[in-house]
Amino acid sequence: MIGPISQINISGGLSEKETSSLISNEELKNIITQLETDISDGSWFHKNYSRMDVEVMPALVIQANNKYPEMNLNLVTSPLDLSIEIKNVIENGVRSSRFIINMGEGGIHFSVIDYKHINGKTSLILFEPANFNSMGPAMLAIRTKTAIERYQLPDCHFSMVEMDIQRSSSECGIFSLALAKKLYIERDSLLKIHEDNIKGILSDGENPLPHDKLDPYLPVTFYKHTQGKKRLNEYLNTNPQGVGTVVNKKNETIVNRFDNNKSIVDGKELSVSVHKKRIAEYKTLLKV
């Protein structure tokens, strides 16, 4: 069985054996089989996987840190705990880190924060995979902002940005995990957004940066799992150089990739990519 999230210690590195022991191998196999069936029969869009992701996320974060030891990915189960976690990374001299943050108080929503320490200044940017018009993202953003302001971290600059790439109801956790990895892999491309955050150019600190203002800052690889074709086209209209960019080992462009993962749901073209990503992530936890 999967242990309660509050009982799983995700700080520090665990071995592959310890990671796998957080969840029954047999149960995990059954979950993966059901996820694959949901994609095959087309029921994936109308199912809610959020509670399952909340339970599995600690193991996924450990696995991510095992794969990328310098990513410094942290799972924060409530905004109330965020400031002390940030204080710890600053005091430990960590220059760059990521935080997957959960709503807490029984909530299911996730976002991801990218942290960078530049010339004695702290830059924190919350990346929301959906948009702030929905209750979950809005509440998590407010709680996060309040927690950071209450602690009064020295020379700390905080902004919230919306990616608006999520259309289904329960994929915020997998989106946040995928974005956390991209924030690490593409870290050299993100220097400008952090510099603009510190300068106060990125946002006024009160209102989130809308997706059309965010798009020029991010490489096309951040949009691999974009669920809506219209949203993907919006990004490519702003970043035409991304149209021909190869985004994976299959030599696919972002448009090729969308077409190869698209499904028609309620008359709309939607990508099933992030649901396949969940399966791939869950499979990394299986014992050989």
UniProtKB/Swiss-Prot annotation:
Q: Which residues bind CoA?
A: H109, R167, S168, Q227, G228, K229, K230, D266, G267, K268, E269, L270
- Which Gene Ontology MF annotations are present? acyltransferase activity
Q: Where is the signal peptide?
A: none
List required co-factors: 1D-myo-inositol hexakisphosphate
Activity regulation here? Answer: 1D-myo-inositol hexakisphosphate activates protein-acetyltransferase activity via an allosteric mechanism: 1D-myo-inositol hexakisphosphate-binding induces a conformational rearrangement that stimulates the interaction with acetyl-CoA.
Query: So what EC number does this one have?
Result: 2.3.1.-
Q: Which GO terms describe its cellular component?
A: extracellular region
Q: Which InterPro entries match?
A: YopJ-like
Q: What is its main location?
A: secreted
Question: Which keywords fit this entry according to its UniProt record?
Answer: Acyltransferase, Plasmid, Secreted, Transferase, Virulence
**What reaction gets catalysed by this protein?**
L-threonyl-[protein] + acetyl-CoA = O-acetyl-L-threonyl-[protein] + CoA; L-seryl-[protein] + acetyl-CoA = O-acetyl-L-seryl-[protein] + CoA
Sum up the protein's function in the record's words.
Serine/threonine-protein acetyltransferase translocated into infected cells, which inhibits the host immune response and induces cell death by mediating acetylation of target proteins. Inhibits the MAPK and NF-kappa-B signaling pathways by acetylating protein-kinases such as MAP2K1, MAP2K6, MAP3K7/TAK1 and I-kappa-B kinase (CHUK/IKKA and IKBKB) on serine and threonine residues critical for their activation by phosphorylation, thereby preventing protein-kinase activation.
Q: What is this protein called?
A: Serine/threonine-protein acetyltransferase YopJ
Species this protein is from: Yersinia pestis
